[in-house]
Every structure is written in C-alpha cells, then in structure tokens.
C-alpha cells in the first residue's frame, strides 16, 4: 500500500437524487436505491483502502450530494481552495468541507461569493505536478482560474466544456501517472483540444469513444499504476493495460443517476508541490462598453452569447437601462478569455457590434510594418463592412475605403495620417498595418427591435400569408428604387444567368431602360444567355416561350459567343443590329456600364468578359463606389464578391430560391440587408408591377 497517498470520502447515509442540476438527474428523482448505493460506495471504499489511506467527512442530512467529495475544494500541498457552488442545492455543503479542511491543518482560500468554482471536479492536477488543468463552461467560471494560479502558485491551463452531459472536467478528463491522459475530445471546444494536443504527446493521449464516456470512464481514480472506474469497454481496458495500468472496475450505477462515479466520490488530499513550478495563467480580462437599444434589439443577448460561444466568460458590471422606449441603454461588461488568441477573436466580434473600451482604458492601435509586398503581419486585424475608426497617437482616425476582409494600412501623407482598408495583394513593404484588437472601434447605427424582426422574408414558407410578406418586401424595394432614381442616386445590380432562365430578363431590361439601374455586375453567363434568348429565343437551349428544350439547343450559346466574338464586342453587336433587345442591349443603348467577371468554367468567353481576376475585382469595386442600393439576383459567387467590397450603410436586397444562399448573402450583420427567398423571375415581375403603381412612364435622356 502507498501510505502517503490519502483520499477524502463521505459515506452515502443521506444520498439520494432530490433535485435536477445536471442532465443525468433528469428522470431519476427519488429513483436511487439507498441500499444499492451503500453497497456500491463500500465497494469503491474497500478497493481504495487497499491502495491508499481514506479519510471520511461526516455525512449531513439535507445535503445528499455531500457524498461527491471531489467538489469539496482543490488541494495542493497544505493549501486548499474551497469550492463555491453554482447551484443553491449544493451551497450548504461549503461550511462542512471548510470545517474538515481547517480541522486537518490546511490553509483555506475562499473565492468571492459570486464566483463559482467547484473544486477538483473542475480542476485536475497533472499527475507529474507540472500544471493544473482547469475546466469552465457549465459550473466553474473562467475568472476563478487566476485565483487558483495565485494561491497555489502553479501554471493553470483553461479548458472549455461544451457538452452539458460532461458538466465537470472530471467527467470527461483524467490525468494519469507517467504523463498519460484519459479524455473524451468531444466534450471540449477546438481551442481546448488543441491545447491538450500541444501539452500531451500523442503517445500519451488516450482518447475514448462516446460509449465509454457516457459510462464515466474518465471519472476514474488513479493511484500510481491502478485505475479504478465504473466500467470500461474491452478496447479501453486493452489500451490502458497496454501502457502499464491495471484496470479495476467497480459498479457505481446508483451514483451515475446523479451524474457522478469513482472520481466524483473521492478527493485526493495529498498533492505534492514541485518547487520549480510557479504561477502562470493565460486568462485575460478586458472591460468593454456597449450602447444602443440593448434589450429590444437583442443586442446585449447577442454580445453575451457571442462571448460564451467563442470560449470566453463575462460579468455585467453596470447596466443603465433607457428610461423611455426611444432611449438607448448602456452596459459595461467584463470579458474574460483563456488566452490572448481567444480574447482577440472575442473582441473582434464585439467590435463589430459597436463595443468600445472605457474612456480611461483607451489605447492606441498596435502597428507592425509590412515586410513583403502583398503580405500582412501574422496578427493583422481583419476589416469588416462597418465604418471603422482607429486610434493613432491619441487621435481617432476614420478608415477609408471600408470593406470586408482587408487589412487596415496606415500611411503618412502631407495632410496627416491616412488609414485605409486594403486587400492583401495591395499592401506595400514599409506600410504600417493594424494588428491585434487595441484602439479599434466601429460606428454603428442604433438598431431597434423592428429592424431586427424584418431582416429576412421567405416565399411560400411556414406562417400565415407568406406570399403577402414577399409582396411587402417588393413594395419596399420598389419605393426605394423610385426614391433613389428620382434623387439621381445609384443602384447596382449583380445578376446571374438564372435571371434569364426564369424569364426575368425582360423585367431587368425594363429596369435598366427606365433608369433604375446605374451599373450591372455579373459573369460571362448572364450576358451569353441574355443574348442567346434575344437572338435565338432560347436560354441554355430551352425555348423561353414554350418551356421545352430545342433540338440542338445546347449549341446555341456557343453560336452566340462566336457571333459576338466575330463582331468584337457586345456594343458592336448592338450597333450592327444583331442584338435588338435584352439586358445587354439596354445597357449599351442607355450607356449603363457593365462588368463581366470571368471564371474557369466560361465558354468562349465573350470579348467583353474580363478574364483577369484582379482587374475584374478592381472594376467591380470602381462601379460599387457611391452605390445606395445593390440588387443581388441569383448569383451567389458574384454577390458574395460584391458583398465583401461593400461597406455598411448600403441597402442590399438578396434574392435566390435557395434559402442557404440568401442567408449567406444577407446575414452580414448589416441592418440594411434584406433576404428574399423566391424565384428571381417572379420577384422581378412583381417589382416592375409595383413600380407601375408608383410612377409614370420614364423617358430615357440617352439615345
């Protein structure tokens, strides 16, 4: 027997499932057998006594979970951090555990009352004593980890739990002797799994399957080469014996009903201290402020959910609620993250929501030089669609050329510092680029409940009068088109060939002819099939009047391409009279600029199609400047490209029959975006009908 190893247990005299505080308890209230629980506990107790010393804490009536002594606290040397239970059903256990620790000569540290930490259930020492694995996500708070590092003088590695079945770290994670680790990867987020893989060599990691995990195979007591558990599959037992462990199974099914097994029923109270190991914690905290219609728009919920979903935790320090419906609210939130990497990701997302530092915490943005043309520093800040300002030398500077997925470059000009979004290929050596997430803020429009609730419209979806809902969107779009046209504004259309295939070409042609469109962006295909329809009456070989395939029609588009190539351009085809109507005809006749961006699948292509991708992107960006509205008509590829080039504030209408496409295009966080799930030909037909109701015939000033 290894007499120096000691464990603390509590007899199950008052054990029962009296309430539900984890998924395992659901359906098991008062369904546990006291006699069987005592028998199973005694089985574990006797096995453990053969390999270690076992101390007992006195059971207390009214506290059925006192039997799970792993949650008493966390012991290292002569120090113990007492648990702060999340649920009131267990908070009454704290004084009894504190009394036992103090009576046995331990120095007891107590966390603030509002900071949950559930002891060795959520904090497991590496069996070599090198560091402490600390879990968070369901019971213990991430903010408790710096206290553990300070009081126990040890490096703390934070792991986020994401499967509610494994609500404590010890239900899915068990450090073993000789540097081995038994764990269930599915219980952790990707960052935590990566951290585990960085710290534990592949040959030392024993990853278990879900079938073993739900039998609490990781809730194991390890005494040197002995592992004591509820149950293990033959494959798991073979893995453990293969690396030198002796597996001892003892049934603990009565305790599984409350969400615990062998490890939960024990607390190791002799944990040696390594003198060369000292405190190190990677948890970062930062206080942010967010303002707006936080409640009725759901903004505060989105911000807090975003923090948790990205791997952080939060504490709302102050919340000032607007006094009236039109008043805005403000909140100060402490954000914590397990590492700087995760903190950067969280803050980047919060910046998109309009979060800012407290005035006293404002700092200049961090800059790093571009070393190689077209290559940003590794940690560069990725720009978004929202108007952005960066803090340089104590001054906030507006970022020019706002767009998604760029870097923010800082250059000195005769008129002062210039901050502008640049795509990576345009970066030049010597420029300074914003890195990290300090000194960055976005300027967001105040968002109300009404705006959030009218984001996306579906045609023929569930609900009452869904067709009417699409008509309502069409009415709004028509009204906006009319207003922009009459004010001399700019509307850009990006369209795919489906517009032609669905019979929408004549309606789009009319929009161009009547002055509602100031630029057309698309690919080779929309022009090819538009011209095919107007020269040969087919689109992709289908007769547009009868809706049937024409014999040999699959060759029509190639003949059209060949004809236009012979003339040299679409404009020359119009001038020669071979193109007499259609979308491209109206663009040429009304001097509406168009850009056709090529792709690897293009036939021909048409002579007007820009096959240089970089030039095509530049031409797209040029024609998007000054746009007030963009109609994205059934072209996911080109529409996504346009969306990435477009700053917030531009109204976007995304139309596609595929809901996934609409969601992808419209869900960019812009409150000006509207998604319409419907047939694009039908949408354009409804749109022109609605415009007829709003306006008198329009006479073109050109031609």
Swiss-Prot record:
It holds the Pfam family ArgZ-like_C_2nd. The active site is at 168 (proton donor/acceptor), 264 (nucleophile). L-ornithine binds at residues 22, 90, 139, 168, 264. L-arginine binds at residues 22, 65, 71, 90, 139, 170, 258. One of its GO terms (molecular function) is lyase activity. The keyword Hydrolase applies. It comes from the Bacteria. Ornithine cyclodeaminase activity is inhibited by ATP. Disruption phenotype: Neither proline nor glutamate is observed in filaments of the deletion mutant when incubated in the presence of arginine or ornithine. Mutant shows substantial diazotrophic growth. Residues 285-694 are annotated as: Ornithine cyclodeaminase. In the N-terminal section; belongs to the DDAH family. In the C-terminal section; belongs to the AgrE/ArgZ ornithine cyclodeaminase family. Homotetramer. Bifunctional enzyme involved in a cyanobacterial arginine utilization pathway that produces glutamate and enables cellular adaptation to nitrogen fluctuations. Catalyzes the hydrolysis of arginine to ornithine, with the release of ammonia and carbon dioxide. Then, catalyzes the conversion of ornithine to proline, with the release of ammonia. This is Bifunctional arginine dihydrolase/ornithine cyclodeaminase AgrE. It comes from Nostoc sp. (strain PCC 7120 / SAG 25.82 / UTEX 2576).
């Amino acid at each position: 027997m290894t007499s120096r190893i000691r464990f603390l247990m509590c007899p199950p005299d008052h054990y029962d499932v009296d309430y539900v505080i984890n998924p395992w308890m659901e359906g098991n209230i008062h369904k546990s057998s006291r006699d069987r629980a005592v028998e199973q506990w005694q089985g574990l107790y006797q096995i453990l006594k053969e390999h270690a010393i076992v101390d007992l804490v006195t059971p207390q009536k009214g506290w059925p979970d006192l039997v799970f002594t792993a949650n008493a606290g966390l012991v290292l040397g002569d120090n113990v951090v007492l648990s702060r239970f999340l649920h009131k059903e267990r908070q009454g256990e704290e004084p009894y555990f504190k009394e036992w620790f103090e009576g046995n000569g331990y120095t007891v540290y107590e966390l603030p009352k509002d900071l949950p930490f559930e002891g060795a259930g959520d904090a497991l020492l590496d069996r070599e004593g090198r560091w402490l694995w600390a879990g968070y996500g369901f019971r213990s708070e991430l903010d408790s980890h710096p206290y553990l590092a300070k009081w126990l003088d040890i490096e703390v590695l934070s792991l986020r739990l994401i499967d509610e079945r494994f609500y404590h770290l010890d239900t899915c994670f068990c450090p073993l002797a000789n540097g081995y680790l038994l764990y269930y990867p599915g219980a952790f987020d990707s960052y935590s799994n990566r951290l585990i893989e960085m710290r534990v060599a592949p040959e030392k990691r024993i990853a278990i399957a879900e079938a073993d995990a739900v039998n609490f195979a990781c809730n194991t007591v390890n005494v040197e080469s002995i592992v004591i558990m509820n149950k293990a599959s033959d494959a798991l037992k073979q893995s453990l014996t293969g690396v030198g462990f002796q597996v001892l199974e003892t049934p603990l099914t009565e305790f599984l009903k409350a969400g615990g097994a062998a490890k939960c029923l024990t607390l190791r109270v002799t944990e040696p201290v390594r003198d060369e190991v000292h405190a190190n914690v990677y948890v970062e905290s930062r206080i942010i402020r967010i303002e707006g219609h936080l409640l009725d728009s759901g903004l505060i919920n989105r911000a807090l959910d975003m923090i948790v979903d990205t791997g952080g935790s939060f504490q709302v320090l102050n919340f000032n609620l607007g006094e009236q419906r039109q008043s805005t609210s403000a909140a100060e939130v402490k954000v914590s993250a397990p590492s700087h990497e995760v903190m950067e990701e969280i803050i980047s997302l919060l910046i998109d929501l309009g979060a800012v530092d407290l005035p006293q915490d404002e700092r200049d943005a961090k800059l790093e030089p571009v070393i190689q043309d077209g290559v940003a520093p590794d940690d560069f800040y990725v720009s978004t669609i929202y108007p952005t300002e960066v803090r340089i030398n104590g001054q906030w500077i507006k970022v020019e050329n706002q767009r998604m997925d760029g870097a923010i470059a800082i250059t000195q000009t005769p008129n002062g510092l210039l901050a502008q979004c640049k795509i990576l290929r345009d970066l030049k050596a010597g420029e300074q680029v914003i890195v990290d997430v300090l000194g960055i803020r976005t300027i967001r429009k105040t968002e109300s409940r009404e705006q959030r609730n009218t984001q996306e419209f579906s045609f023929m979806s569930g609900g009452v009068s869904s067709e009417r809902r699409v008509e309502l969107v069409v009415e709004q779009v028509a009204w906006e088109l009319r207003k922009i046209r009459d004010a001399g504004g700019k509307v850009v259309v990006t369209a795919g060939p489906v517009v032609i295939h669905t019979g929408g070409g004549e309606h789009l042609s009319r929009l161009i002819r009547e002055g509602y469109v100031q630029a057309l962006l698309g690919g080779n295909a929309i022009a090819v099939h538009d011209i095919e329809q107007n020269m040969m009456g087919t689109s992709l070989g289908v007769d547009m009047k009868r809706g049937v395939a024409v014999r040999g029609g699959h060759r029509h588009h190639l003949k059209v391409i060949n004809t236009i190539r012979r003339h040299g351009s679409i404009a020359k085809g119009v001038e020669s009279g071979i193109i007499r109507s259609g979308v491209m005809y109206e663009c040429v006749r009304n001097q509406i600029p168009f850009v056709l961006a090529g792709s690897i699948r293009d036939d021909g292509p048409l002579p007007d199609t820009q096959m240089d991708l970089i030039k095509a992107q530049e031409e797209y960006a040029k024609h998007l400047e000054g746009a007030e509205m963009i109609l994205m008509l059934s072209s996911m590829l080109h529409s996504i490209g346009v969306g990435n080039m477009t700053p917030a504030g531009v109204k976007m209408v995304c139309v596609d029959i595929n809901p996934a496409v609409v969601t992808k295009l419209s869900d960019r966080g812009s409150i000006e975006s509207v998604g319409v799930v419907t047939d694009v030909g039908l949408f354009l037909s409804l749109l022109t009908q609605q415009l007829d109701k709003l306006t008198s015939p329009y006479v073109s000033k050109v031609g």
